[in-house]
Amino acid sequence: MNPVPAQREYFLDSIRAWLMLLGIPFHISLIYSSHTWHVNSAEPSLWLTLFNDFIHSFRMQVFFVISGYFSYMLFLRYPLKKWWKVRVERVGIPMLTAIPLLTLPQFIMLQYVKGKAESWPGLSLYDKYNTLAWELISHLWFLLVLVVMTTLCVWIFKRIRNNLENSDKTNKKFSMVKLSVIFLCLGIGYAVIRRTIFIVYPPILSNGMFNFIVMQTLFYLPFFILGALAFIFPHLKALFTTPSRGSTLAAALAFVAYLLNQRYGSGDAWMYETESVITMVLGLWMVNVVFSFGHRLLNFQSARVTYFVNASLFIYLVHHPLTLFFGAYITPHITSNWLGFLCGLIFVVGIAIILYEIHLRIPLLKFLFSGKPVVKRENDKAPAR
């Protein structure tokens, strides 16, 4: 069994927080990109489209590696049932809280912004269900995927731990070349599965719950397991935290391929399958780029960094409806895309931080948006002298 390190790994906490917070410029730039979203500016910006594509190409792959790392750390700390309960509570409770408080009002707002409120009664029962699945899960999809992954890893982590007890983990050797081949094969395998589904029964791919629970889990699970393995094997972790010119160059070339596929690919052809192969290996290489960068610059304790590490989930949860509100009601009045982007950042981040500070002062909201029970300090119970 791998001992849990006594010292907190600050760079991983910081990277996870900043990856979460990158969702804010990602969604604001989406308004000004050439991609069709709920709300868009009158004219798209080439550079903001490029910025948006860059964030989208790797952010969640690296995020799930870090999630897998910390998840296995807790797996060794708690009994199995308690581990599952703690992990599911910490992601499931915020998700269930955000649906009625955030994504439901967001959905109602968009119905009127997009002029679809009148046509809602005419939709079939399935169309209403599927629309609600997409719109209510919305940006919370990764929390649902983490619940599914945690449940699957009750078995997967047990198998990993049992195999470790019967083998010498010090002899395990990893290289970026071997990992690249493995993840290339995983990307091709995912593409084959998606193409097979597309041929056999294409409507299921537009089903929101199937997309989140099956397809997204299937794609990101290798990264989650990779994170667990990085916790188990110090050599693998060192491989990611050591700067590699090869990984950086490969990631740059993969990003160019990603852009070309976005530009010239067709959804009716092989665009999505090609993208899955590219982003699978790109995500692996960016783990090295991001980890090595973070290990060099973010591996320290700071009150300011700790604040945003603690606030990142709440800020991410509330930023999405704020971004859509900004895009629907404020963006049309700002003619400059870059000025609108900067104003959007100030608007969303400013209000999100204010809401975060308010929710800290309300114990029920603090619990609901973190999934962590509020623990009273012993000093609070001591009688006054």
Curated annotation (Swiss-Prot):
Q: Key word Transmembrane helix present in the record?
A: yes
Provide the transmembrane region boundaries.
Answer: 17-37, 60-80, 91-111, 137-157, 173-193, 212-232, 245-262, 274-294, 311-331, 338-358
Q: Does the keyword Lipid biosynthesis apply?
A: no
Q: Which keywords does UniProt give here?
A: Acyltransferase, Cell membrane, Membrane, Transferase, Transmembrane, Transmembrane helix
Q: Which Pfam families match?
A: Acyl_transf_3
Give compartment(s). Cell membrane
**EC code:** 2.1.-.-
One GO cellular component term noted in the UniProt record for this chain: plasma membrane
Q: What class of enzyme is it?
A: transferase
Q: In which pathway does it act?
A: Glycan metabolism; osmoregulated periplasmic glucan (OPG) biosynthesis
Question: What membrane topology term does the record carry?
Answer: Multi-pass membrane protein
Q: Which GO terms describe its molecular function?
A: acyltransferase activity, transferring groups other than amino-acyl groups; transferase activity, transferring one-carbon groups
> What HAMAP family does this protein map onto?
MdoC_OpgC
User: Which family does the record claim for this protein?
Assistant: Belongs to the acyltransferase 3 family. OpgC subfamily.
Q: Main role?
A: Necessary for the succinyl substitution of periplasmic glucans. Could catalyze the transfer of succinyl residues from the cytoplasmic side of the membrane to the nascent glucan backbones on the periplasmic side of the membrane.
* Record protein name field: Glucans biosynthesis protein C
Protein source organism: Escherichia coli O81 (strain ED1a)
The gene is: mdoC
